[in-house]
């Protein structure tokens, strides 16, 4: 046999580290994120395909150890053995190793066996190092795991290969193991030995283990969070970059009369009402289930557990498509304090998450609590906007959005930390969730596409108060209404008034600086540009140089879409590789014709590119070929070999 070469993973949509994708295997295609029900090869009685399983996982070691199952698997194949015609992943016996301390098979033997029975995705025999062990023991076992992963490549023939990330609760070892595995020619990466963390609700440590691993894994390879089968965890895990989950929980919990839900777990004997609207919950009452024989009751509860689990996977995929995954995460994490603690821990990894966060999304940003202030969108905005504020700031309380349309033309009643006089002042609205909003940017995503409760919580007040104090270190005056709202007392009164009208040219220049970097505004928009407004909305729509279109201001997010003249100006005025995606010779003629750019043809790009950025498509000599919208971030563009990377808007340069 030869390696099945059509394996493919393609990213279809993104929200932070979360992504939906297509995983193509020899026995079919899987939509990710995906849940893999665990199938017991000898006693499976539950239908998993009906509720939604596109891929399953079974234990090759159990098959190997049972003479009857082994003979049937070798003669008929694992698909016929477990009666599932879709993709099958097999485990190598690592679970038994972690439970019993020893197993009766060597790594080469179990790798060959998985290949011989026709599994789609096999797994090397890693060492599942438990949480809390010494650094010395953990590194020794990581080295064994790495050696076995390398060895597995030699023995596998046709199947795809899992290489498991280990490292216990030592983030440095997780990163080390992941970085070494990333160098190997394997296809997927489980993140292992995390079940004890989940069982004991140690979600903060789980976040460290997962994100330390993901930080070093290639974006082109799906990541499998091993043993994560409870639906209350799916949203958080996907937001950390996990694509696959396996669930034995659906049947194990059913054995104990426990029903899964996204809010937690219900014991059947405590229920007065059934918890969801699946067929089991609508057809039976708790008392009716309690009156059944044990096997029938177990099967029905398992069916419910599968339905609620697959429903949550579908909801997570839709949330990624809509761009509101983090709102779902914040909702789910309020099901348990330890889960919320884990989510809060993610704020320690904002620089990692920011690399994968799209620049613009189709959904608004909702402030649902103080955790929202730790989201990457807020982190990114504050980092960028402070570069563009300049000096002499007038900080004002929020009004109805867009602020620039609802504020009075002139505002009086300001105070300051030091005596101030004269003008002009740059007007900055101070408001949740983004804190600092210059009027020139009040129609730009995500500042305009956000909402927060009118009654602030204490964390929100302190967040805004801290920003105001930081800005008062320079020349700043503060609206008395804002001082009152935030409980700030300032010694000096400013007796003048502040002009709030925003000049159109100032607006488009600042948007360009915010979007493309400092200096882009004057580069794109000289003093003689012509600005057109929409007849319907009155908002800026097009910016021209004579009759040549420089940019369109997109109505949905207030960001700039490059026209032909804008692309030429940005290309001439910036050095390679700024805002560029370079394609090879094979792709060049297609890009010139306006065809989309696929990841496998990209030879270089600007490391600062994020999904939904406007980009310049060039060849190896930096000749401008076309413009387009990035669908992937820079790291994904350079790593993936499948799928669209840039949706080309205009070619023919």
UniProtKB/Swiss-Prot annotation:
GO terms under biological process: tRNA wobble guanine modification
Pathway named in the protein's UniProt entry: tRNA modification; archaeosine-tRNA biosynthesis
Annotated signal sequence range: none
Cofactor annotation comment: Binds 1 zinc ion per subunit.
Active site: 91
GO CC aspect terms: cytoplasm
Enzyme Commission number(s) from the entry: 2.4.2.48
Reaction(s) this enzyme catalyzes, per UniProt: guanosine(15) in tRNA + 7-cyano-7-deazaguanine = 7-cyano-7-carbaguanosine(15) in tRNA + guanine
Binding site for substrate: 126, 193
Keyword Metal-binding: yes
Top-rank lineage group of the source organism: Archaea
Required cofactor(s): Zn(2+)
InterPro entries attached to this UniProt entry: ArchSynthase1/Queuine_TRR, PUA, PUA-like_sf, PUA_sf, TGT-like_sf, TGT_C2, TGT_C2_sf, TgtA
Residue numbers binding Zn(2+): 276, 278, 281
Function: Exchanges the guanine residue with 7-cyano-7-deazaguanine (preQ0) at position 15 in the dihydrouridine loop (D-loop) of archaeal tRNAs.
Family the UniProt entry places it in: Belongs to the archaeosine tRNA-ribosyltransferase family.
Protein name, entry field: tRNA-guanine(15) transglycosylase
Organism: Methanothermobacter thermautotrophicus (strain ATCC 29096 / DSM 1053 / JCM 10044 / NBRC 100330 / Delta H) (Methanobacterium thermoautotrophicum)
Annotated gene: tgtA
């Amino acid at each position: 046999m030869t390696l099945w070469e059509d394996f493919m993973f393609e990213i279809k949509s993104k929200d932070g580290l979360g992504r939906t994708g297509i995983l193509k295997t020899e026995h079919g295609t899987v939509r990710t994120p995906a849940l893999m029900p665990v199938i017991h090869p000898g006693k499976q009685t539950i239908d998993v395909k009906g509720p939604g399983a596109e891929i399953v996982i079974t234990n090759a070691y159990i098959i190997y150890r049972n003479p009857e199952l082994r003979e049937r698997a070798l003669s008929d194949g694992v698909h016929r053995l477990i009666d599932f015609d879709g993709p099958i992943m097999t485990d190598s016996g690592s679970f038994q190793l972690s439970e019993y301390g020893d197993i009766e098979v060597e790594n080469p033997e179990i790798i060959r066996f998985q290949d011989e029975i026709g599994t789609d995705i096999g797994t090397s025999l890693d060492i599942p190092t438990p949480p809390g062990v010494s650094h010395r023991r953990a590194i020794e076992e990581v080295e064994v795991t790495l050696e076995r992963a390398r060895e597995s490549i030699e023995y596998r023939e046709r199947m795809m290969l899992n290489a498991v990330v280990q490292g216990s609760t030592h983030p440095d070892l997780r990163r080390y193991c992941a970085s070494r595995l990333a160098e190997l020619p394997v296809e997927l990466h489980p993140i292992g030995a995390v079940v004890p963390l989940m069982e004991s609700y140690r979600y903060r440590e789980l976040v460290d283990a997962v994100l330390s691993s993901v930080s070093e894994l290639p974006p082109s390879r799906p990541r499998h969070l091993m043993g994560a089968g409870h639906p209350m965890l799916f949203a958080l895990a996907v937001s950390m970059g996990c694509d696959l989950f396996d669930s034995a929980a659906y049947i194990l919990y059913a054995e104990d009369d426990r029903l899964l839900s996204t809010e937690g777990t219900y014991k059947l004997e405590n229920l007065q009402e059934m918890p969801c609207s699946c067929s089991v919950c609508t057809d039976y009452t708790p008392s009716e289930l309690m009156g059944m024989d044990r096997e029938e009751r177990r099967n029905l509860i398992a069916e419910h557990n599968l339905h609620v689990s697959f429903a949550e996977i579908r909801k997570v995929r839709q949330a990624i498509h809509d761009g509101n995954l983090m709102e779902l995460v914040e909702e789910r994490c309020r099901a348990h304090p330890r889960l919320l603690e884990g989510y809060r821990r993610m704020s320690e990894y904002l620089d990692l998450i920011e690399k994968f966060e799209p620049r613009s999304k189709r959904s608004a940003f909702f402030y649902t609590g103080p955790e929202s202030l730790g989201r990457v969108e807020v982190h990114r905005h504050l980092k960028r906007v402070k570069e563009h504020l300049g000096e002499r700031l007038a900080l004002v309380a929020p009004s109805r959005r867009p602020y620039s349309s609802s504020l009075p033309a002139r505002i009086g009643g300001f105070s300051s930390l030091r005596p101030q006089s004269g003008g002009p002042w740059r007007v900055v609205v101070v408001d949740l969730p983004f804190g600092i909003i210059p009027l020139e940017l009040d129609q730009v995503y995500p500042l305009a596409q956000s909402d927060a409760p009118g009654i602030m919580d204490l964390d929100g007040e302190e967040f805004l108060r801290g920003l105001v104090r930081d800005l008062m270190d320079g020349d700043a005056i503060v609206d008395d209404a804002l001082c009152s709202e935030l409980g700030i007392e300032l010694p000096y009164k400013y007796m003048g008034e502040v002009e709030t009208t925003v000049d159109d040219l100032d607006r488009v220049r600042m948007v360009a600086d915010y979007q493309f970097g400092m200096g882009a505004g004057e580069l794109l928009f000289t003093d003689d540009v012509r600005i057109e407004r929409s007849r319907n909305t009155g908002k800026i729509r097009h910016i021209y140089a004579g009759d040549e279109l420089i940019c369109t201001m997109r109505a949905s997010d207030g960001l700039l879409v490059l026209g032909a003249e804008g692309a030429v100006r940005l290309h001439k005025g910036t050095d390679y590789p700024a805002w560029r995606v370079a394609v090879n010779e094979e792709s060049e003629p297609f890009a010139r014709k306006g065809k989309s750019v696929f990841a496998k043809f990209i030879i270089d790009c600007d490391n600062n590119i994020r999904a939904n950025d406007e980009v310049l498509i060039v060849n190896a000599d930096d000749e401008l070929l076309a413009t387009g919208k990035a669908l992937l971030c820079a790291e994904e563009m350079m790593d993936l070999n499948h799928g669209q990377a840039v949706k080309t808007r205009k070619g023919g340069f």
